[in-house]
């Protein structure tokens, strides 16, 4: 079988067309420079590609998408370049088994199998025989080292990963070809173009503390940010702020730490009001909810927000929109002085978990009428811990705000996901 190979700067998955076709020489130059490019493999007489490969060495990433004759994506393969430049980790793979030619691409009822692998030998295999809404069976995948890793081919020497899926029994013959340019190839790449996986990105975090801003959380169509509440202060004499779930195992210390100047910092709640019809009251009522908490390091505005990473996180392994943060199985998080972490955590356990009635009020204080629950204080160092309620168990990202000069100005935790901004001037997002 002859496989035609063409190159482009990007691939538009919605329209299944390349963006900005390039010659093989330019693709080779981009490969050497680590810049992203795509490889499109086609067969004569077939409209849909056999497979498309996105290469971006600067992002440690190679992705392979396989298409069937109907133009539906059947397989996704995510390869990662780590410390050994000669091999790639098979980080993530998903296979979709469409039940017939009439089933739409990515149909929720499509059976699928997903496999995640990690360089330390761990992994997870999930089977969904009835699709996303059916039962899910999770097991540890049994794969050898050769199955976990694959050789990194040189430019122009990559195999057709989908040869078996397309029924090829003999190695294909590759022929270089020039891809046809789409009519809209001028200007910037469409936002729908395939890009290397990115970890979760910040939304309008600073705006959540700005009165008058209109947002939606997806459930409430319109919410209006009100003046943030200030709930006391937190002392961090060690200069290292801990953000963690105080209710889980901490053998290795707090989940997240952020260096800050030693000092005492304001604790805030971001709040938003919304109006809805209450069946009990039989009238419109207005409710104000806390949507985020923040430790304010400086009054300077945040120029950027970035998700904090845990000590063992490897950003090269992150999937699209993957989060990191602190874990909780008791719907609780905290800001604390990492230098006094152990004694502060012991006081938290004695006061909230064990309910010790004899705790000195100088070291343990309940906080009422707030998402902040309590404060503990280490008398030896002066360091403090302030626990706050989350809206459930799981992992909560920690967002670090920095000034134009790169200094930390705030550390925030969103309690119910990332809201979206609504247009100004009283126009709804749907208008």
Q: What positions do the PLM features span?
A:
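Extended, low-hydrophobicity segments enriched in charged/polar residues
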Residues: 185-358
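A short glycine-rich beta-turn/N-cap micro-motif
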Residues: 46-51, 70-75, 107-111, 120-123
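N-terminal low-complexity, intrinsically disordered segments
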Residues: 18-58, 422-424
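Beta-turn initiation residues at beta-strand->coil junctions
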Residues: 53-58, 65, 75-83, 126-130
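C-terminal structured interaction module
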Residues: 118-137, 368-418
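Intrinsically disordered, low-complexity segments enriched in Gly and acidic/Ser/Thr residues
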Residues: 110, 347-383
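A structural detector for short beta-strand units
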Residues: 33-41, 61-67, 87-90, 113
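Long terminal segments
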Residues: 1-33, 95-193
């Amino acid at each position: 079988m002859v496989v035609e190979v063409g190159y482009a700067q990007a691939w538009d998955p919605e329209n299944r067309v390349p963006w900005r076709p390039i010659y093989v020489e330019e693709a080779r130059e981009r490969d050497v420079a680590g810049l992203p490019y795509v490889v499109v493999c086609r067969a004569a007489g077939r409209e849909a590609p056999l497979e498309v490969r996105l290469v971006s060495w600067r992002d440690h990433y190679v992705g392979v998408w396989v298409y069937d004759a109907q133009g539906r994506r059947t397989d996704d393969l995510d390869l990662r370049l780590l410390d050994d430049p000669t091999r790639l980790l098979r980080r993530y793979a998903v296979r979709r088994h469409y039940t017939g030619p009439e089933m739409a691409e990515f149909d929720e009822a499509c059976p699928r199998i997903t496999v995640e692998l990690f360089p330390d030998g761990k992994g997870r295999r999930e089977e969904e025989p009835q699709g996303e809404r059916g039962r899910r069976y999770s097991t540890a995948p049994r794969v050898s080292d050769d199955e976990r890793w694959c050789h990194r081919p040189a430019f122009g020497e990559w195999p057709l990963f989908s040869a078996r899926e397309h029924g090829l029994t003999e190695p294909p013959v590759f022929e270089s070809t020039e891809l046809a340019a789409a009519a809209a190839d001028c200007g910037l790449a469409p936002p729908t173009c395939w890009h290397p996986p990115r970890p979760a990105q910040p939304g309008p975090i600073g705006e959540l503390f700005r009165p008058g801003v209109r947002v939606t959380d997806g459930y409430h169509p319109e919410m209006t940010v009100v003046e943030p509440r200030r709930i006391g202060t937190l002392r961090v004499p060690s200069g290292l702020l801990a953000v963690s779930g105080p209710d889980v195992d901490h053998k290795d210390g707090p989940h997240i730490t952020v260096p800050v100047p030693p000092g005492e910092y304001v604790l805030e709640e971001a709040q938003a009001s919304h109006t809805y019809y209450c069946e009990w009251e039989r009238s419109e009522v207005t409710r104000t909810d806390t949507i985020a908490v923040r430790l304010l390091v400086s009054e300077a505005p945040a120029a950027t927000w970035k998700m904090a990473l845990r000590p063992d996180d490897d950003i090269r392994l992150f999937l699209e929109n993957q989060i990191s943060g602190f874990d909780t199985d008791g719907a609780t998080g905290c800001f604390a002085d990492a230098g006094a972490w152990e004694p502060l955590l012991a006081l938290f356990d004695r006061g909230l978990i064990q309910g010790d009635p004899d705790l000195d009020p100088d070291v343990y204080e309940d906080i009422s009428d707030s998402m902040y629950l309590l404060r503990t204080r280490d008398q030896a160092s002066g360091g403090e811990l302030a626990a706050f309620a989350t809206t459930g168990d799981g992992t909560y990202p920690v967002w670090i705000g920095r000034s134009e000069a790169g200094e930390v100005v705030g550390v925030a935790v969103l309690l119910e996901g990332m809201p979206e901004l609504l247009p100004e001037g009283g126009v709804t997002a749907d208008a």
